[in-house]
Amino acid sequence: MRFFLKLAPRCSVLLLLLLVTASRGLNIGDLLGSTPAKDQGCSRTCESQFCTIAPLLRYGKYCGILYSGCPGERPCDALDACCMVHDHCVDTHNDDYLNTMCNENLLSCIDRVSGATFPGNKCNVGQTASVIRGVIETAVFAGKILHKRDDGQ
């Protein structure tokens, strides 16, 4: 029973990811005919909101689903820098949010996060990193499944 309870949160995220017919489906802008970052603006402010709620998480300028800093904006701290590099990687791979290399690099970067956070941060960096890790681990798993299917394997 404990095994299934541990899997429940990941299974719900995995189910959501599997319902997406293409890896680009995570980009809501594709469904709406526009890119959220272009229409809603990009972040120039270090934020710390919804720290443990993955779909709503806003951390620094770059961490969060469909949330990113403006071009040229410096990250707020080490965790935010990991998210900035991940955002750039995803951008250079056709907005493929399930790109295994980008996601595994983010996980490695999160493992190395240390140092001070930004002034006014209301999030516990370790908890926030754990939330991001859970989402990205699920994306790695889904990416491996969906990309095998896309490759005809």
Swiss-Prot record:
| Main location (coarse class) | secreted
Which reactions are catalysed by this chain? a 1,2-diacyl-sn-glycero-3-phosphocholine + H2O = a 1-acyl-sn-glycero-3-phosphocholine + a fatty acid + H(+)
Q: Where does Ca(2+) bind?
A: Y62, G64, Y67, D87
A GO cellular-component term linked to this record: extracellular region
Record key words, sorted:
Calcium, Disulfide bond, Hydrolase, Lipid degradation, Lipid metabolism, Metal-binding, Secreted, Signal
Question: Which InterPro entries is this protein grouped with?
Answer: PLipase_A2_dom_sf, PLipase_A2_His_AS
Q: Where is the active site?
A: H86
The Swiss-Prot or TrEMBL record lists the needed cofactor(s) as: Ca(2+)
Which positions form S-S bridges?
A: C42-C70, C46-C76, C51-C123, C63-C83, C82-C109, C89-C102
The entry's function note states: PA2 catalyzes the calcium-dependent hydrolysis of the 2-acyl groups in 3-sn-phosphoglycerides. Releases lysophospholipids (LPLs) and free fatty acids (FFAs) from membrane phospholipids in response to hormones and other external stimuli.
The positions making up the signal sequence are: 1-25
Identify its protein family.
Belongs to the phospholipase A2 family.
Q: Where in the cell is it found?
A: Secreted
Name this protein carries in UniProt: Probable phospholipase A2 homolog 2
Q: What is its EC number?
A: 3.1.1.4
What note does UniProt attach to the cofactor annotation? Answer: Binds 1 Ca(2+) ion per subunit.
Instruction: For this entry, list what GO says about its biological process.
Output: arachidonate secretion; lipid catabolic process; phospholipid metabolic process
User: Which EC class heads this enzyme's classification?
Assistant: hydrolase
- What species was this sequence derived from? Oryza sativa subsp. japonica (Rice)
UniProt-recorded Gene Ontology molecular function terms: calcium ion binding; lipid binding; phospholipase A2 activity
